[in-house]
């Protein structure tokens, strides 16, 4: 092996001791490496998915072209020319048209119960004043109209919360106090208190970019229903957390398809995955982004002796 590209979750770079062990082992194998973490995401290079990962790159010492300069003695962003390849995504701040297919099988439509849930939260979004933070029904103190009573309610457990959670929960409380007439009626009409706890949490971080949640990118996660602006997709994961979009043709909310997910990981359109959508989603959630890996491979290739890297085939390509 003459070159390599390792990828891992971003917080690996925060664990200094682990990082130093990895770097030491790679250098002991005769590699010139990126001793400082290179943290990048596809959305920095024209692919609309936020997926920050740390990359550790290296090239064998005897494969490195000594005519190239290493001012710091190791590989850096400047040597690899990473910043020269930065590119923005959609110019209008909406990436959906770049990724979404026009005709999608109905099997990707959201189940009616979950689609109904999104319409219920849309009603909430349209009517509540001051929706600038997550709203948690189960921590807002529904039916409690006295602040002191709320603060000392044992079921809510406000006094026992860590400070960060107190601040978050208090925002839900203030939102309820300022909108309790609408919220009480809304909760009763839609029987919100009996719903799954995940469905009782809502976060809309669209700013003024979405007139309705149909304009955004939605996820139903352990932390609740989350709607974000359509500039980038969230990171694909291996768990059941597939992004949801509004399909104007079908007039339904639906999941992003495996083919669309593959676009977010920069796979060629003709790449064939297995027949199981569940397995394909998991594979894509665990995958590295093809464009980033290829970009780093080309950067390493350009630093090497072509005869060494290609085994004498100087006209070869990556």
How does the language model describe each region?
Residues 1-217:
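Class I S-adenosyl-L-methionine
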Residues 125-318:
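C-terminal target-recognition/interaction regions appended to catalytic cores
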